[in-house]
UniProtKB/Swiss-Prot annotation:
It comes from Simian immunodeficiency virus agm.vervet (isolate AGM TYO-1). It comes from the Viruses. This is Gag polyprotein. A lipid is attached at G2 (N-myristoyl glycine). A zinc finger (CCHC-type) spans 397-414, 418-435. Residues 486-496 have a biased composition (Basic and acidic residues). PANTHER family: ENDOGENOUS RETROVIRUS GROUP K MEMBER 24 GAG POLYPROTEIN-RELATED (PTHR40389), IGE-BINDING PROTEIN (PTHR40389:SF3). The record marks N438, F439 as: Cleavage. GO terms for biological process: viral budding via host ESCRT complex; viral translational frameshifting. One of its GO terms (molecular function) is zinc ion binding.
């Protein structure tokens, strides 16, 4: 877009920067949005100079409007931006994107066109120009006859949107090849190239498809050489490999080769086969798992295993006979042991319906419980064989209170008896038993012998002189006790007979000495 702002002049650019992205929002449009829109136009095969005029923006809106309801976030953003530019070129004052989209719907009559397109696809067989479609063909047929000439009708945006959405979701899975076959039925090389050009995120896969196209085109040139000498006047030339690929041929030449040439050369069908070969190679590259590696897990349901198996079979590039042999041999061979036992019991060449019905309960809760019960029974039988038979039976219960069999002490109806566990006598407990205790406190129930203490030496004499005869030995505690007794006796006597008060002391401390005769 040149300086990236050539789509708008200075006055329009000032108005553009005042329009809000959302109603009552803070963010507004900037120049970087125009630069982004110019780059996004190339993904849809549109020139960026269409943004510079009102008519160009209208054409962009007509292309993007059918894709907008189911398109990606980038496509919706581009559609909203083009609506804002259309209002600026139309000199319609808008405040935000939502108001601009509503204005475009009103001025371009998009709602009415959508209703008429729905009615036409449901029952009508004529387009807006009054051109009748060929018998047995819908309005999306890529070529329509007008008089004696064939007119090319481009692919519907809905078809392109369905193709792009399928590639984005499946990532060149096994479903892409039949999807391409359905959407490209009856298309010209120009239409097929348009379907490939709208894929922008898978250039590695498209490069593989281009290599296959170049190889097939070179092989076509070898097997179909040019005739010697110049062509007669008015005769259509034979298509070359590059003509079939749509690089050196026009749309009108492709229509003439398909419909009016003698002999006819269906360049669209030939180019379609080349694309399918390339897509099959891409599918094999994006799905490296071979059908030989598909095995049923120990807990996987048989239905899920069959789905994975046939998906891998679908991605295999082999003939129908080879796929049939792989299905008959590998489907049962790669099943888990439980399903394999059931499938082998069905006989030779069972149908898929019979196999699914027979293995329907394998892997479910009831089947797992049944298998677990059988395993536990088997393990129990093995343990009994290893242990050498059942264990010896225990003797009958005996009461410790009454000595009878058949019940325990806590269930005994007779009164509880107190019995010593040391001597075996009744009437006392073991802690009170003295019949088994000697003079040292050692009984039979103790775990060790009493310790030995050194005995006092007989005949040892004290070193101090003996006290005089007739006197008691000196005891300091006894003497101290006598002193305390005497002191207590004195205190009791003083309390009983307090001393008399001294008159001199009373006079010396009376108030008369302070005030004298004033009292």
């Amino acid at each position: 877009m040149g300086a990236a702002t050539s789509a708008l002049n200075r006055r329009q650019l000032d108005q553009f920067e005042k329009i809000r992205l959302r109603p009552n929002g803070k963010k507004k449009y900037q120049i970087k949005h125009l630069i982004w829109a110019g780059k996004e136009m190339e993904r849809f095969g549109l020139h960026e100079r269409l943004l510079e005029t009102e008519e160009g923006c209208k054409r962009i809106i007509e292309v993007l409007y059918p894709l907008e309801p189911t398109g990606s976030e980038g496509l919706k953003s581009l559609f909203n931006l083009v609506c804002v530019l259309y209002c600026l070129h139309k000199e319609q004052k808008v405040k935000d994107t939502e108001e601009a989209v509503a204005t475009v719907r009103q001025h371009c009559h998009l709602v009415e066109k959508e209703k008429s397109a729905t009615e036409t696809s449901s029952g009508q067989k004529k387009n807006d120009k009054g051109i009748a479609a060929p018998p047995g063909c819908s309005q999306n047929f890529p070529a329509q006859q007008q008089g004696n000439a064939w007119v090319h009708v481009p692919l519907s945006p809905r078809t392109l949107n369905a193709w792009v959405k399928a590639v984005e979701e499946k990532k060149f899975g096994a479903e892409i090849v039949p999807m391409f076959q359905a959407l490209s039925e009856g298309c010209t090389p120009y239409d097929i190239n348009q379907m490939l050009n709208v894929l922008g995120d898978h250039q590695g896969a498209l490069q593989i498809v281009k290599e296959i196209i170049n190889e097939e085109a070179a092989q076509w040139d070898v097997t179909h050489p040019l005739p010697a000498g110049p062509l007669p006047a008015g005769q259509l030339r034979d298509p070359r490999g590059s003509d079939i690929a749509g690089t050196t041929s026009s749309v009108q030449e492709q229509l003439e080769w398909i419909y009016t040439a003698n002999p006819r050369v269906d360049v669209g069908a030939i180019y379609r086969r080349w694309i399918i070969l390339g897509l099959q190679k891409c599918v094999k590259m994006y799905n490296p798992v071979s059908v030989l590696d598909i095995r049923q897990g120990p807990k996987e349901p048989f239905k899920d295993y069959v789905d994975r198996f046939y998906k891998a079979i679908r991605a295999e590039q082999a003939s129908g006979e080879v796929k049939q042999w792989m299905t008959e041999s590998l489907l049962i061979q790669n099943a888990n042991p439980d399903c394999k036992v059931i499938l082998k019991g069905l006989g030779m060449h069972p149908t898929l319906e019979e196999m699914l019905t027979a293995c329907q309960g394998v892997g479910g809760p009831s089947y797992k419980a049944k298998v677990m019960a059988e395993m536990m029974q088997t393990m129990q039988n093995q343990n009994m064989v290893q242990q050498g038979g059942p264990k010896r039976q225990r003797p009958p219960l005996r009461c410790y209170n009454c000595g009878k069999f058949g019940h325990m002490q806590r269930q005994c109806p007779e009164p509880r008896k107190t019995k010593c566990l040391k001597c075996g006598k009744l009437g006392h407990l073991a802690k009170d038993c003295r019949g088994q205790v000697n003079f040292l406190g050692y009984g039979r129930w103790m775990g060790a012998k009493p310790r030995n203490f050194p005995a006092a030496t007989l005949g040892a004499e004290p070193s101090a002189p003996p006290p005089p005869s007739g006197t008691t030995p000196y005891d300091p505690a006894k003497k101290l006790l006598q002193q305390y007794a005497e002191k207590g006796k004195q205190l009791r006597e003083q309390k009983r007979n307090p001393p008399a008060m001294n008159p001199d002391w009373t006079e010396g401390y009376s108030l008369n000495s302070l005030f004298g005769e004033d009292q």
